[in-house]
Amino acid sequence: MKEGVGSTQNRDRIAMAVTALVLFGAQWFIGDFPLWFFAAPMNLLLGVLWLVALWEGYRHRERLSAVRYLLSAEATYVALAVATVVAVVLGLQSEPASTSWPVVGGLLFVQSVLTLVILRGWRNERGVRWRFLVTHIGLWLAVTSALFGAPDKEILRVQVGENPTREAISEQGEKRFLDYELRLEKFDIKRSESGSPQQFCASVAVDKRVVTIEVNSPYSPRYGEEIYLVNYAAEGCVLQIVREPWRGVTATGVVMMLLGAVVLFLQGFSSEKR
């Protein structure tokens, strides 16, 4: 029996290694993962189907060695390592890395392990484990928004001049029309004592509201959308609009993780007092 278990575990490890090689090979030979294809509603549909598949896999885990492996301590350690590496990579180069096959595959693995862990541990003989749920669901929301929310992130560029415009260009070169008008009021270049440019500042009318946009100091017309100053030319300035509709999900996950950490600290403090 032990040999059978060991053989199954080795087979699962080999499958993981082969999957990792396939992901890196896809990145090398195919290029970036086509996130645009999985934009809403495709990502929502696939996300629901994947959760249903994980739930069914958990229900029949006694017959599925792959699910049992994902529920093992080894898979948890691997998921923690993968999550750490992905976080570092995304922190260093968010835009190019988020579309790579290894990062997408790594996030899917972490999300799968986390989902199964939540299904197994959300309650015990004493009832619902609320602290466990708050912390783990918070992490689950953060990982899920990074995985399934990435296709919905949109980056647009707008050439803004004296005449109002609603037309923007996507990263794929497609036209997009904004639900607000943009018009350049004025552009200032603040220089240092030596005469070199020190700060770039654009006054832009967003519909009827005039706002100031500086380099690395964007304006947010609504939650999850920011307008950045990118460049300036004789015909006007170039603005970049970044839309992240899943930002609220990410923020909720982070708040839940912090809340879980606070509850853990308070419980530990009260235990020490007793």
Which residue stretches match the model-derived regions?
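Solvent-exposed, non-transmembrane regions of integral membrane proteins
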Residues: 1-274
